[in-house]
Amino acid sequence: MDDNNLPQKDLIKKIVGDARGAVGIRLCAIGVDLGIFEDLAKNGPATSQELADRMNLDERYLREWGLGMFSLGYLDFDKVSRKISLNKEFIPVLVEEGGKFSQKGLIEILNSSLLPYHELLNSFKNGGGINYDKIDKGFWNGIDQTGCTRYRHFLVTDWVDKMPELKSRLETGSVTFADFGCGSGRSTIEMAKKFPKSQFFGFDLFEPNIERAQNIALDAGVKNNLKFMQWDVSNPLTEKFDFVACFDLIHDMIDPLEGMKTIRKAVKDDGIFVLMDIKCEDDPADNEGPMVPFMYAMSLHFCMTTSLANNGAGLGTVGLPEAKVKEYCDLVGFKTVKRIETDHPLNSVFEIRP
């Protein structure tokens, strides 16, 4: 048999391609975290020495990084002037925060989530998982960045529009909206900006997230109809809300069923629960598309493992398909579950009523 036709050749070719992508993300993360892309966008082409002088970074490292990024197709390189430059068409993807095309968050998530590798190997051998305190801060920055893009360009311009009663009541005002697991508050802030007559409350388990959310809200000029509070969703609230939302929360929870019980108690009998989670199939073998490997990798490195680290259910990133949503809703007393058709490639949205 001709060696060029061996099946091993195809696998080797795939591995080489995957390796190129892996190192590409690492080099991109350097450009994002050190602000090199931002400098090139703002100040224009530069030699490695000019860039070093502008940014107070080491020239030799910048030279190697720049050539690597050129070889990957992220930067242009002029062989005569020896200057690297960033195509202006790439600025919305690599530089702009919260833009519709921004991928800064994805880059940071991918790079940082892969760091606790040996702890993950230990979990394979002994069970358990990686706790939240082992997760690199770059991961949280990435989550914030992707949330900024997603909620600014999908939540208030697409998803809410497809729930007319929700939108109408929020516009009329005098209603309350609770965002459970609000993280850095991007979703809550966008809703509060869009519907100034209604009152919004963001709850999150982690105090640093609440502090960050408060600062982002302050910078956005949103304060009169918005409040953030540290709170564990496993502890029931005495207050009830007209609307409750969870965005990418339930599949991460240690005890998702108990969390759903808390949510049901928090929603008024004539209220609506808006659930957004990862778009996935009832049979995980049916999940298809370019982002599916990313979902399983994130599950191993964050979603599933952090739950298992706390003796949780470990649903994982693709652990909340529509059938599981309906199962939980039935168990906790929600009566209707309506899937909202959206254009987002990664998320499903459900309008759920008592």
Tell where the protein language model's regions lie, with residue ranges:
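Conserved Class I S-adenosyl-L-methionine-dependent methyltransferase catalytic core
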Residues: 2, 6, 15-22, 27-31, ...
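A short acidic, leucine-rich amphipathic alpha-helix
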Residues: 48-53
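Short amphipathic alpha-helical interaction segments
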Residues: 57-68
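A short glycine-rich, Lys/Arg-flanked "PGG" loop and its adjoining helix->strand segment in the class I
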Residues: 257-269
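C-terminal alpha-helical "lid/dimerization" subdomain adjacent to the S-adenosyl-L-methionine
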Residues: 276-331
